[in-house]
Amino acid sequence: LNKDQFTINVSNRKIVQGLIDELKIPEEKQTKVIRAIDKLDKPGFGLKGVEDLLKKERKDQSGAITKGADLSDDQAQQILNFLKIKDLKQLKETLKNPLSQEGIKELEDVFEVLGYGSNLNQVKTNFTIVRGLAYYSDFIVETNLNFKVTNNKGKEVDIGSICSGGAYAKLISRFRGVDIPGTGISFGVD
Protein backbone atom coordinates (compact mmCIF):
# COMPACT_ATOMS: atom_id res chain seq x y z
CA LEU A 1 0.00 0.00 0.00
CA ASN A 2 1.08 3.55 -0.67
CA LYS A 3 0.95 6.00 2.24
CA ASP A 4 -2.05 7.83 0.80
CA GLN A 5 -4.11 4.63 0.54
CA PHE A 6 -4.76 4.20 4.27
CA THR A 7 -5.48 6.18 7.41
CA ILE A 8 -4.51 5.12 10.92
CA ASN A 9 -7.03 6.52 13.41
CA VAL A 10 -5.90 6.69 17.02
CA SER A 11 -7.66 7.54 20.25
CA ASN A 12 -7.53 6.73 23.93
CA ARG A 13 -10.36 5.03 25.80
CA LYS A 14 -9.56 7.07 28.92
CA ILE A 15 -10.83 10.19 27.14
CA VAL A 16 -14.39 8.95 26.72
CA GLN A 17 -14.33 7.08 30.05
CA GLY A 18 -13.46 10.35 31.79
CA LEU A 19 -16.42 12.02 30.07
CA ILE A 20 -18.71 9.16 31.12
CA ASP A 21 -17.46 9.46 34.70
CA GLU A 22 -17.92 13.25 34.68
CA LEU A 23 -21.51 12.85 33.44
CA LYS A 24 -22.14 10.35 36.28
CA ILE A 25 -23.49 7.71 33.90
CA PRO A 26 -24.27 4.58 35.94
CA GLU A 27 -22.05 1.57 35.31
CA GLU A 28 -24.96 -0.52 34.00
CA LYS A 29 -25.46 2.01 31.15
CA GLN A 30 -21.81 2.54 30.22
CA THR A 31 -21.47 -0.39 27.81
CA LYS A 32 -24.49 0.83 25.83
CA VAL A 33 -22.99 4.33 25.70
CA ILE A 34 -19.64 3.01 24.42
CA ARG A 35 -21.36 0.84 21.81
CA ALA A 36 -23.52 3.77 20.68
CA ILE A 37 -20.44 5.97 20.19
CA ASP A 38 -18.67 3.15 18.34
CA LYS A 39 -21.47 3.09 15.75
CA LEU A 40 -21.07 6.73 14.68
CA ASP A 41 -19.25 5.90 11.43
CA LYS A 42 -21.32 2.81 10.61
CA PRO A 43 -23.68 3.03 7.61
CA GLY A 44 -27.12 4.35 8.56
CA PHE A 45 -26.08 5.78 11.93
CA GLY A 46 -24.37 9.16 12.10
CA LEU A 47 -25.06 11.54 14.99
CA LYS A 48 -28.83 10.92 14.83
CA GLY A 49 -28.42 7.15 15.18
CA VAL A 50 -26.01 7.61 18.07
CA GLU A 51 -28.39 10.08 19.73
CA ASP A 52 -31.23 7.56 19.48
CA LEU A 53 -29.04 4.86 21.08
CA LEU A 54 -27.96 7.23 23.84
CA LYS A 55 -31.58 8.04 24.62
CA LYS A 56 -34.55 5.68 24.57
CA GLU A 57 -34.24 3.50 21.44
CA ARG A 58 -33.25 3.34 17.78
CA LYS A 59 -35.45 1.99 15.03
CA ASP A 60 -33.48 0.84 11.98
CA GLN A 61 -34.58 0.69 8.33
CA SER A 62 -36.01 -2.81 8.77
CA GLY A 63 -38.18 -1.65 11.67
CA ALA A 64 -36.13 -3.48 14.31
CA ILE A 65 -35.83 -1.58 17.58
CA THR A 66 -32.66 -1.47 19.67
CA LYS A 67 -33.10 -0.32 23.26
CA GLY A 68 -30.99 2.72 24.09
CA ALA A 69 -28.96 3.69 27.15
CA ASP A 70 -31.82 5.89 28.45
CA LEU A 71 -29.58 8.87 29.25
CA SER A 72 -30.94 12.28 30.15
CA ASP A 73 -31.15 14.85 27.35
CA ASP A 74 -28.23 16.76 28.91
CA GLN A 75 -26.01 13.67 29.17
CA ALA A 76 -26.76 12.69 25.57
CA GLN A 77 -26.13 16.23 24.30
CA GLN A 78 -22.77 16.47 26.06
CA ILE A 79 -21.67 13.20 24.45
CA LEU A 80 -22.87 14.40 21.03
CA ASN A 81 -20.92 17.66 21.54
CA PHE A 82 -17.84 15.59 22.39
CA LEU A 83 -18.24 13.60 19.16
CA LYS A 84 -18.00 16.84 17.13
CA ILE A 85 -14.55 17.74 18.53
CA LYS A 86 -11.81 17.20 15.95
CA ASP A 87 -8.50 18.22 17.54
CA LEU A 88 -6.54 17.61 20.73
CA LYS A 89 -6.32 21.30 21.66
CA GLN A 90 -10.10 21.76 21.66
CA LEU A 91 -10.55 18.45 23.47
CA LYS A 92 -8.07 19.47 26.15
CA GLU A 93 -9.91 22.76 26.68
CA THR A 94 -13.32 21.06 26.81
CA LEU A 95 -12.79 17.94 28.94
CA LYS A 96 -11.45 18.72 32.40
CA ASN A 97 -11.89 15.29 34.00
CA PRO A 98 -8.48 13.98 35.22
CA LEU A 99 -8.93 10.63 33.44
CA SER A 100 -9.77 12.39 30.16
CA GLN A 101 -6.76 14.67 30.61
CA GLU A 102 -4.55 11.61 31.19
CA GLY A 103 -5.79 10.05 27.95
CA ILE A 104 -5.22 13.30 26.05
CA LYS A 105 -1.66 13.52 27.41
CA GLU A 106 -0.98 9.93 26.33
CA LEU A 107 -2.19 10.76 22.80
CA GLU A 108 0.00 13.86 22.73
CA ASP A 109 2.94 11.62 23.67
CA VAL A 110 2.13 9.25 20.78
CA PHE A 111 2.18 12.12 18.30
CA GLU A 112 5.39 13.48 19.79
CA VAL A 113 7.10 10.11 19.26
CA LEU A 114 5.71 9.82 15.72
CA GLY A 115 7.07 13.27 14.95
CA TYR A 116 10.63 12.23 15.79
CA GLY A 117 10.99 9.31 13.42
CA SER A 118 8.74 9.80 10.46
CA ASN A 119 6.35 11.90 8.50
CA LEU A 120 3.22 9.82 9.02
CA ASN A 121 0.59 12.23 7.81
CA GLN A 122 -1.88 9.37 7.58
CA VAL A 123 -2.04 9.03 11.40
CA LYS A 124 -5.06 10.99 12.66
CA THR A 125 -6.84 11.49 15.96
CA ASN A 126 -10.41 10.25 15.93
CA PHE A 127 -12.04 10.48 19.33
CA THR A 128 -15.05 8.48 18.15
CA ILE A 129 -12.89 5.36 17.91
CA VAL A 130 -13.72 3.69 21.22
CA ARG A 131 -13.92 0.01 20.20
CA GLY A 132 -17.15 -1.47 21.53
CA LEU A 133 -15.41 -4.07 23.68
CA ALA A 134 -15.16 -3.22 27.36
CA TYR A 135 -11.67 -4.63 27.87
CA TYR A 136 -9.85 -1.84 26.02
CA SER A 137 -8.32 0.45 28.63
CA ASP A 138 -6.39 3.22 26.88
CA PHE A 139 -4.66 3.43 23.46
CA ILE A 140 -6.91 2.42 20.53
CA VAL A 141 -6.05 2.13 16.84
CA GLU A 142 -8.16 1.51 13.75
CA THR A 143 -6.72 1.41 10.23
CA ASN A 144 -8.95 2.11 7.23
CA LEU A 145 -8.36 1.86 3.51
CA ASN A 146 -8.98 5.11 1.63
CA PHE A 147 -10.17 3.51 -1.59
CA LYS A 148 -12.99 1.33 -2.82
CA VAL A 149 -12.66 -2.10 -4.40
CA THR A 150 -14.89 -3.90 -6.85
CA ASN A 151 -16.67 -6.93 -5.37
CA ASN A 152 -17.57 -10.14 -7.21
CA LYS A 153 -20.86 -8.56 -8.33
CA GLY A 154 -19.04 -5.70 -10.05
CA LYS A 155 -20.11 -3.16 -7.42
CA GLU A 156 -17.66 -0.71 -5.82
CA VAL A 157 -17.59 -1.19 -2.05
CA ASP A 158 -15.80 0.47 0.84
CA ILE A 159 -13.78 -2.08 2.80
CA GLY A 160 -13.41 0.21 5.80
CA SER A 161 -11.39 -1.00 8.76
CA ILE A 162 -8.73 -3.62 8.02
CA CYS A 163 -6.77 -3.54 11.28
CA SER A 164 -7.98 -2.60 14.75
CA GLY A 165 -6.92 -3.05 18.32
CA GLY A 166 -5.53 -1.37 21.35
CA ALA A 167 -4.29 -1.70 24.88
CA TYR A 168 -6.07 -3.69 27.53
CA ALA A 169 -5.01 -3.59 31.16
CA LYS A 170 -7.31 -6.23 32.65
CA LEU A 171 -8.27 -8.64 29.86
CA ILE A 172 -5.93 -11.41 30.97
CA SER A 173 -7.23 -11.19 34.55
CA ARG A 174 -10.53 -12.60 33.27
CA PHE A 175 -8.71 -15.84 32.51
CA ARG A 176 -5.73 -15.91 34.88
CA GLY A 177 -6.86 -13.88 37.90
CA VAL A 178 -3.80 -11.62 37.54
CA ASP A 179 -3.70 -8.16 35.96
CA ILE A 180 -1.23 -8.34 33.07
CA PRO A 181 -1.42 -5.42 30.64
CA GLY A 182 -1.24 -6.16 26.96
CA THR A 183 -1.71 -4.74 23.51
CA GLY A 184 -3.20 -6.49 20.52
CA ILE A 185 -4.54 -5.96 17.04
CA SER A 186 -6.49 -8.01 14.57
CA PHE A 187 -6.55 -7.93 10.79
CA GLY A 188 -9.60 -8.67 8.72
CA VAL A 189 -11.61 -7.77 5.66
CA ASP A 190 -15.36 -8.30 5.43
What are the language-model segments listed below?
Residues 1-25:
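Internal, well-ordered domain-core segments that constitute the primary functional module
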Residues 9, 26, 40, 122-124, ...:
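Generic detector of bulky aromatic hydrophobic side chains
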Residues 20-21, 33, 41-45, 58-65, ...:
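Short alpha-helical interface elements
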Residues 1-5, 14, 51-190:
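Positively charged, Gly/Ser-enriched RNA/tRNA-binding surfaces
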